[in-house]
A protein has these predicted regions:
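Initiator methionine at the very start of the polypeptide chain
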Residues: 1, 13-14
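Short, positively charged and aromatic/hydrophobic N-terminal segments
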Residues: 2-9
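Conserved ASCE/P-loop NTPase catalytic core
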Residues: 14-271, 282-299, 307, 312-317, ...
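Short alpha-helical scaffolding segments that buttress acidic/His motifs in well-ordered protein cores
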Residues: 277, 301-305
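C-terminal helical "lid" subdomain and adjoining coupling/linker elements of P-loop NTPases
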Residues: 287-294, 307-383
Length: 492
C-alpha cells in the first residue's frame, strides 16, 4: 500500500526471450559478466537514477522520505530491514526490488541453488563443470524467479530456511556424508537473488541466530555437515517498530547486521491517500449500472483514515492501515450500488447516507479504545461526521451557504436517505436555487441527477455539522433538514 498494491505483485514475466547461449563456452563468447547480486542491483539502480526514472512503480507518498533512504542503501550494498506499521507497503517495496535485477541470469543446468557458471558452489554443479568443462550446459532464470519470501511464524525451522538431510535420498542408497543428500532450504535456493522475511520478530530467537552467518559471513552451514556454501543474496526483512501483539522481538546481533534500517509511514497528506485509494480500490460494477465517486467523497474516505490516525480513541500502536481507506471506498461504492439497484437507477453516485456502511469495513481494521462497552459505534459515527465536516470546510465557501440558509429560514424542509431517488433529490435545485452555485462547484461538469443528488446531500450534511441546520436523523442514514430557528411544528 503507500502504497501501491499491494503490494502483492511481481514485475511480470517478460516477453523478451531468454538469451540463446546454452553452454559455458557460448556464455563466455557472448561477453556475459558475472557480478555479485548487490553490485548487479546497484548498477541497474544507477542506470535508472541517471535516466531520472523511478526505481519503483506504484509506490506513492515516499518520494521524499523512504525512497532516498532506500536508494542510499542500494548504492551502499546494504541488507535492509523495513520498520513500519501494517499497511505501509513494506512488502510491495520489497517485491519491487526484482525490477532492479537483470532480466535473465545464467545458471548451471539442473542446479537447485542457481550456481554461477563461472563459480559453481554445489556438488552437482562442480561435478558437472569438472566433467564437461566449458561444454557444461547452462539454463536461464528470469528475474521474477530470483525472489524468495518467507512469512515468519513461530514454527519456522532452520530446515525451512537453510536445509537438512533428505531422508528420501538416504533411503535411495546415498551415504549420509554425501553432499547430494542435502535438501536445500529457501535461502540457498534463492542464491544470487533477493530473499525476504516478512514479520521478522515472529521468527523464534534461535532461528534468528541461524541468520547471522548469512548476513555476516555470507554463507550457510547445514546441520550435520562440515560444508559451508557461500551464498550470494540480498536479504531484506520487514517488521513492526513496536510489536503490539507482543509475539517476539528482533535479537540485537541480527538487527546490528542489517546495513540499513528504514522507517516507513502512513500517507502524510490527504491528497496522497486519495491517489492511493484510486490506484488500489476496485469498486463494484454490475451490468449497465455504473458507480462514479466524486472527488469530495474520495476526500471524505481519505480524511476518515487521517483523523483515525490522530484520534485518542483509536489504538495507535496497532496502526490505521491504508487498507482501511481502500475498504471503506469499496464498501461505500457497494452501498451506493445496492441503493441504486433497489431504486432502479443505472447511474449511481455515493452519498453521505452511504457512509453508514463503514461500520462493516472498519470493524476489523482499527481498535477502538473506549472506556465504556459498546462505544465503538459512536466513535465510528463521530469520525464519519468529523470527516464530512473537514472536507465540507475545505471545498465549500461559507459565503455560498448564506443564501441556502436563508431559504431554510423561510421554511424549506428537505428529506434525504437511501429511500429517496436521485431524481427527487436533484429537484431540490428548483426549490432552493441558492444550492446551484455550490452544487456546480462540486459536480465538476457531471450534471446527472445522481451527481446532483449526492452534492446536495453533502452540502446539507455539511451545513448541519457546521451547526447551521437542524437534522432529524432517520434509520436509513438520511434525515430531515430544517432551519435551526424553525421548529418541526411550525412547518406543519
Amino acid at each position: 500500500m503507500p502504497f501501491g498494491s499491494s503490494a502483492y505483485y511481481s514485475q511480470g514475466m517478460s516477453s523478451t526471450p531468454a538469451p540463446s547461449s546454452a553452454t559455458i563456452s557460448q556464455l563466455k563468447s557472448s561477453g556475459w559478466i558475472s557480478r555479485p547480486i548487490k553490485e548487479e542491483i546497484r548498477l541497474n539502480a544507477v542506470t535508472k537514477i541517471m535516466a531520472k526514472q523511478p526505481l519503483f512503480e506504484g509506490v506513492l507518498g515516499y518520494e521524499d522520505t523512504v525512497m532516498p533512504q532506500l536508494e542510499n542503501a542500494i548504492l551502499a550494498g546494504h541488507d535492509v530491514i523495513f520498520l513500519g506499521e501494517r499497511g505501509q507497503a513494506k512488502t510491495r517495496i520489497i517485491r519491487s526490488l526484482t525490477g532492479l535485477l537483470d532480466e535473465w541470469m545464467p545458471i548451471i543446468a539442473g542446479s537447485e541453488i542457481n550456481d554461477d557458471p563461472y563459480n559453481p558452489v554445489s556438488k552437482h554443479a562442480r561435478d558437472l563443470v569438472e566433467e564437461l568443462g566449458d561444454d557444461a550446459p547452462i539454463s536461464w532464470v528470469h528475474r521474477d524467479l530470483r525472489y524468495g519470501e518467507k512469512l515468519a511464524t513461530p514454527d519456522t525451522s532452520i530446515a525451512d530456511l537453510i536445509g537438512e538431510v533428505d531422508p528420501i535420498k538416504v533411503a535411495e542408497g546415498r551415504y549420509l556424508s554425501d553432499e547430494l543428500t542435502l535438501h536445500y532450504g529457501l535461502v540457498p535456493r534463492t542464491n544470487r537473488g533477493i530473499f525476504a522475511i516478512n514479520e521478522l520478530p515472529d521468527l523464534s530467537e534461535r532461528i534468528q541466530v541461524g541468520l547471522l552467518n548469512i548476513l555476516e559471513e555470507r554463507d550457510v552451514q547445514v546441520r550435520g555437515y562440515k560444508i559451508r556454501l557461500p551464498i550470494d543474496v540480498l536479504l531484506v526483512a520487514s517488521a513492526n517498530p513496536e510489536d503490539y501483539t507482543n509475539r517476539g522481538r528482533i535479537i540485537t546481533p541480527l538487527k546490528d547486521r542489517f546495513g540499513s534500517q528504514i522507517r516507513t509511514h502512513y500517507p502524510l497528506e490527504t491528497d496522497t491517500e486519495v491517489q492511493i485509494v484510486r490506484q488500489e480500490a476496485r469498486p463494484p460494477s454490475v451490468g449497465n449500472v455504473t458507480v462514479t465517486v466524486p472527488a469530495y467523497m474520495e476526500r471524505v474516505v481519505a480524511t476518515f483514515s487521517q483523523l483515525a490516525r490522530s484520534s485518542s480513541q483509536v489504538n495507535q500502536r496497532s496502526g490505521v492501515s491504508v487498507r482501511l481507506s481502500v475498504s471503506n471506498y469499496e464498501v461505500m461504492a457497494a452501498n451506493a450500488l445496492r441503493r441504486g439497484l433497489r431504486l432502479g437507477e443505472t447511474n449511481v453516485v455515493p452519498r453521505v447516507c452511504d457512509l453508514e456502511a463503514f461500520a462493516a469495513s472498519t470493524g476489523g481494521k482499527i481498535e477502538i479504545e473506549a472506556l465504556e462497552e459498546g462505544r465503538e459505534g459512536q466513535v465510528l459515527r463521530d469520525l464519519i461526521k468529523a470527516s464530512v465536516l473537514t472536507v465540507f470546510r475545505e471545498v465549500v465557501s461559507p459565503e455560498l451557504t448564506r443564501a441556502v440558509l436563508a431559504s431554510f429560514e423561510e421554511g424549506a424542509v428537505v428529506h434525504t436517505g437511501e429511500d429517496v431517488g436521485s431524481e427527487d433529490q436533484a429537484m431540490l435545485l428548483g426549490n432552493i436555487p441558492a444550492l446551484r452555485p455550490i452544487v456546480d462547484s462540486l459536480i465538476e461538469g457531471d450534471d446527472s441527477a445522481a451527481s446532483v443528488a449526492a452534492a446536495v446531500e453533502f452540502v446539507l450534511e455539511g451545513m448541519h455539522l457546521s451547526k447551521r441546520l437542524n437534522k432529524d436523523t432517520s434509520a436509513t442514514g438520511g434525515g430531515t433538514y430544517r432551519s435551526r430557528t424553525v421548529t418541526p411544528s411550525a412547518n406543519n
